[in-house]
Amino acid sequence: MSQATATQAKGIQLSDAALKHLLALKEQQGKDLCLRVGVRQGGCSGMSYMMDFEEPNRATEHDEVFDYEGFQIICDRKSLLYLYGLMLDYSNALIGGGFQFTNPNANQTCGCGKSFGV
C-alpha cells in the first residue's frame, strides 16, 4: 500500500498514489472538481462503494469535506458511518489494478473489492 497523505484525524484516508492519480484525472477534465465518495445498497456483499467527480459547490450541510493538499473528498454523513477510517489507494498493476478500498468497518468483502458488508 502506498504511503498515506492523510492524518489519522481524517475520516477517509488517501494514499499518495491515489492522490496522484486523482489529480491526473482531474487535470484531464480541465475544470475544478472534487471526489464524492459514498455507499449504496447492492453488490456481492450488501453494500457498494460509489465514487464520482463533481463540482465542489455541490457539497451540502449534510456532507463532510476532507482536504488533501488542495484536492477535496466529499462524503455524506450517512455514508461516512460505514466509511470512517477507509483507506483509498491506487495501483496501476495490470492484474488487480485500479482504486482499492481498505475499510476497517467491513466484516466481509467480495472478491472484486468493490462491495462490502458490515
UniProtKB/Swiss-Prot annotation:
* Family named by the database record: Belongs to the HesB/IscA family. Ycf83 subfamily.
- One matching Pfam family is Fe-S_biosyn
Q: What is the name attached to this protein's record?
A: Uncharacterized protein slr1417
Q: Which superkingdom heads the taxonomic lineage of this protein's source? A: Bacteria
Q: State any GO CC term.
A: cytoplasm
* PROSITE patterns the record matches: HESB
* Listed InterPro entries: FeS_biogenesis, FeS_cluster_insertion, FeS_cluster_insertion_CS, HesB-like_dom_sf, ISCA_plant_cyanobact
Provenance organism: Synechocystis sp. (strain ATCC 27184 / PCC 6803 / Kazusa)
Which example biological process does GO assign this protein? iron-sulfur cluster assembly
GO MF entry, a single one:
identical protein binding
